[in-house]
């Protein structure tokens, strides 16, 4: 159902203290479990240190590129038309694009086999930057699904 009143203003997120970046702050907030923000911050910054040691590249740039590579351009939504459910491809809004990229990076980092969450995050960032990794695979699977269902794009709403 649509809202009767005006649009809801998105909450302002204060940028993180180290890189002064809102996307880093959002990532840390999504990484946080049970309100333990200091733990999430430590994990994130430790992961960036691990990236620095492993690759020698700027870890912040690695993170930004990994996040950019993990963001989906299109996704599919189910739409019921005349008793048949179609998977309709739609373009992803920029806010949702960022949210999905962050969510996938965190989810697939947690599923990895490395020891310690910081090293899992670091490994996922490095792979995502290179264009491999589970988060990128998820993005590609969804893109392929949207491509396969392109015929139903006129059911968009």
Curated annotation (Swiss-Prot):
GO CC entries: small ribosomal subunit
Domain of life of the source: Bacteria
Coiled coil: none
InterPro entries named among the record's database cross-references: Ribosomal_uS7, Ribosomal_uS7_bac/org-type, Ribosomal_uS7_dom, Ribosomal_uS7_dom_sf
Gene Ontology molecular functions: rRNA binding; structural constituent of ribosome; tRNA binding
Pfam families: Ribosomal_S7 (PF00177)
Keywords assigned: Ribonucleoprotein, Ribosomal protein, RNA-binding, rRNA-binding, tRNA-binding
Record family assignment: Belongs to the universal ribosomal protein uS7 family.
Entry protein name: Small ribosomal subunit protein uS7
Species of the source: Leptospira borgpetersenii serovar Hardjo-bovis (strain JB197)
């Amino acid at each position: 159902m649509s809202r009767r009143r005006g649009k809801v203003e998105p909450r302002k997120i204060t940028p993180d203290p180290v890189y002064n970046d809102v996307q880093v702050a959002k990532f840390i907030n999504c990484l946080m479990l049970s309100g333990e923000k200091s733990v999430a911050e430590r994990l994130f910054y430790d992961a960036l240190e691990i990236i620095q040691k492993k690759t020698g590249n700027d870890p912040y740039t690695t993170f930004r590129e990994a996040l950019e590579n993990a963001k989906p351009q299109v996704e599919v939504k189910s739409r019921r038309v005349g008793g048949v459910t179609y998977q309709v491809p739609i373009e992803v809004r920029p806010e949702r694009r960022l949210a999905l990229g962050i969510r996938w990076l965190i989810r697939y980092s947690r599923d990895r086999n490395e020891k310690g969450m910081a090293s899992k995050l670091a490994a996922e960032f490095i792979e995502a930057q290179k264009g491999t990794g589970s988060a990128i695979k998820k993005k590609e699977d969804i893109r392929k699904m949207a491509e396969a269902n392109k015929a139903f794009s006129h059911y968009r709403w």
